[in-house]
């Protein structure tokens, strides 16, 4: 049993909770997720099973797309709807569509963002949420992120009321805290704010419409069709350039054999396949020997090569 499962993560579960539940359903210990989603966030969560856990790191650096909702009028400790109210300031004026769109434009491109206190970012060996739960405030590292697209989905021309909410879609780089973006939008508009809803609709090439629920996974297990839920390792890595080696080279790959970059591939990672179209390893450019490739992750062992 191996491959990538596109889980439609439900609300109220951590990514680790999802892994724990899948281990029980699939009766497989080698399971890992490809990037944390907050408990309140739903949507695309690629899960690697069996031998596919070796490729998890190559699926985490993908661009992500989310659809969510910002609420102006009060902020929270966690920057989302699960936290305690920190500041309240009723929206005492009409906010126009143009104002909101201009705020989104200023947050598009390469920007700096400070991670929230309630996050897993580590400072001095401790996670920020551990400091937050102890009531401690620490200096947080500013990170550079890229917002590829930030679009207002609400079709209203004006927004009014003591609290107002509007929907958005954002496509961003790995490491972006969308709830912090919601706070930044509020700052641009002059009001405390938080993220009131969020769903991840895409993680790289993996889309929400292709995801399945826990119930569907359990049904496939019961029906004996569990293999149908997996995206193969080869398919999951299809975005990377590919090299094919002969049988003799394939036997040496497990032992860390370097390869010549005969195809002059410039991409950072290269997948290496055998004549049977099975992915053997992922290679990268050798830092000291131009024109050579070195193994970054070997996906098979000698016993598997003889099968």
From Swiss-Prot:
Reply yes or no: does the keyword Isomerase apply.
yes
Q: Give the UniProt keywords, A-Z.
A: Isomerase, tRNA processing
Q: Which reaction(s) are listed as its catalytic activity?
A: uridine(55) in tRNA = pseudouridine(55) in tRNA
Which residues does the entry assign to the active site, renumbered to this chain? 38 (nucleophile)
- Look up the EC number in the record and give it: 5.4.99.25
Q: Which molecular-function annotations from GO does this UniProt entry contain? A: RNA binding; tRNA pseudouridine(55) synthase activity
Domain of life, per lineage: Bacteria
Report the top EC class in one word.
Answer: isomerase
What function does the entry list?
Responsible for synthesis of pseudouridine from uracil-55 in the psi GC loop of transfer RNAs.
Indicate what this protein is called per its UniProt record. Answer: tRNA pseudouridine synthase B
Instruction: Report the source organism.
Output: Bacillus cereus (strain ZK / E33L)
Gene it is expressed from? truB
């Amino acid at each position: 049993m191996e491959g990538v499962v596109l889980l439609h993560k439900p609300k109220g579960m951590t990514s680790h909770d999802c892994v724990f539940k899948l281990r029980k359903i699939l009766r497989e210990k080698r399971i890992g997720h490809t990037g944390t989603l907050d408990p309140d966030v739903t949507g695309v969560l690629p899960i690697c099973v069996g031998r596919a856990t070796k490729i998890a790191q190559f699926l985490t650096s993908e661009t992500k797309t989310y659809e969510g909702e910002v609420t102006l009028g009060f902020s929270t400790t966690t920057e989302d709807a699960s936290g305690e109210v920190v500041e309240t300031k009723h929206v005492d004026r009409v906010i126009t569509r143009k104002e909101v769109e201009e705020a989104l434009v200023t947050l598009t491109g390469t920007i700096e963002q400070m991670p929230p206190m309630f996050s897993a970012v580590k400072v001095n060996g401790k996670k920020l949420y551990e400091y937050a739960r102890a009531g401690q405030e620490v200096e947080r590292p500013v990170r550079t992120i890229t917002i590829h697209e930030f679009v207002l989905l609400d079709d209203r021309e004006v927004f009014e009321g003591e609290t107002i909410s509007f929907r958005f879609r954002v496509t961003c780089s790995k490491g972006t805290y969308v709830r912090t973006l919601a706070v930044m939008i509020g700052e641009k508009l002059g009001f405390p704010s938080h993220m009131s809803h969020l769903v991840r609709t895409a993680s790289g090439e993996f889309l929400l419409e292709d995801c399945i629920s826990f119930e569907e996974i359990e049904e496939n297990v019961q029906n004996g069709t569990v293999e149908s839920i997996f995206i193969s390792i080869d398919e999951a890595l299809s975005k990377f350039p590919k090299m094919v080696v002969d049988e003799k080279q394939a036997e040496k790959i497990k032992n860390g054999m370097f390869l010549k970059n005969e195809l002059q591939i410039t991409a950072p990672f290269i997948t290496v396949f055998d004549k049977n179209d099975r992915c053997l390893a992922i290679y990268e450019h050798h830092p000291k020997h131009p024109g050579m490739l070195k193994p970054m992750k070997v996906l098979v062992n000698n016993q598997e090569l003889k099968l």
